[in-house]
Amino acid sequence: MSFIVYPALDIRDGRVVRLRQGDYAQETSYGDDALPRAQALAAQGAQWMHLVDLDAARAGGYTLAPLLASIRAQTPLQVQTGGGVRGRDDVARILDAGAGRVVVGSLAVRRPDEVVGWLEEFGAERITIALDARQDAQGQWQLPVHGWTENAGVTLDVLAQRYARAGMRHLLCTDIARDGMLAGPNISLYQHLSALLPGVAVQASGGIRDVADVAEARRAGCGGAILGKALLEQRMDLAEALAC
């Protein structure tokens, strides 16, 4: 399985931002230069990027189609993108706008019967299932919903295996406790998922601080890694990460 590095840009109100543990009240802004940043990522050798619509994630209705179209027209980047997917037509629209893959998150937890059908309709290579997880006191990985305020009632392992049986090829898993914290990725979680889901490209997300973390995610069996805050704050060289 190939390993893909996904430099990430999260967009809110037209600005590149990062949230701390998904909290909209804990935002750091990095400017309104998303397209030049994407062009710079391509110039450094990136083949894919991860683009998140934070406004749509909150209110629905994907708003980044113009930016996505510009990135596709002005760079060779493939784009994995999501935020605000509320139904099948949203997936179709985002793919039509030029996405290489559409990320389906909260809906993948709330309406799995529907999302399983999209893997067949659009093709498993065009859908990334995103599951945000938090470990409970018993060591089980729960899937918080509604702004990470309550658990979905199904564990990460159970739902991930269900999607794997349905043909899922790409799983983005974020350890909520590490999101935006630059504390290192949860390697034991990704080792577990990679062993549990043979043939699925597991994307490590949350806490990656440097090239060593990227290399460790690859050794853990991951098929990719999302690079956010560490790149934006120039704590990591993208070219070195791509060479892992």
Curated annotation (Swiss-Prot):
GO terms for cellular component: cytoplasm. Transmembrane segments: none annotated. Its main location: cytoplasm. It holds the Pfam family His_biosynth. Coiled coil: none annotated. One of its GO terms (biological process) is L-tryptophan biosynthetic process. It catalyses: 1-(5-phospho-beta-D-ribosyl)-5-[(5-phospho-beta-D-ribosylamino)methylideneamino]imidazole-4-carboxamide = 5-[(5-phospho-1-deoxy-D-ribulos-1-ylimino)methylamino]-1-(5-phospho-beta-D-ribosyl)imidazole-4-carboxamide. One of its GO terms (molecular function) is 1-(5-phosphoribosyl)-5-[(5-phosphoribosylamino)methylideneamino]imidazole-4-carboxamide isomerase activity. The active site is at 10 (proton acceptor), 132 (proton donor). It is found in: Cytoplasm. Its EC number is 5.3.1.16. It is an enzyme of class 5 (isomerase). Keywords: Amino-acid biosynthesis, Cytoplasm, Histidine biosynthesis, Isomerase. Gene3D superfamilies: Aldolase class I. Pathway: Amino-acid biosynthesis; L-histidine biosynthesis; L-histidine from 5-phospho-alpha-D-ribose 1-diphosphate: step 4/9. Belongs to the HisA/HisF family. This is 1-(5-phosphoribosyl)-5-[(5-phosphoribosylamino)methylideneamino] imidazole-4-carboxamide isomerase. It comes from Stenotrophomonas maltophilia (strain K279a). The lineage of its organism: Bacteria, Pseudomonadati, Pseudomonadota, Gammaproteobacteria, Lysobacterales.
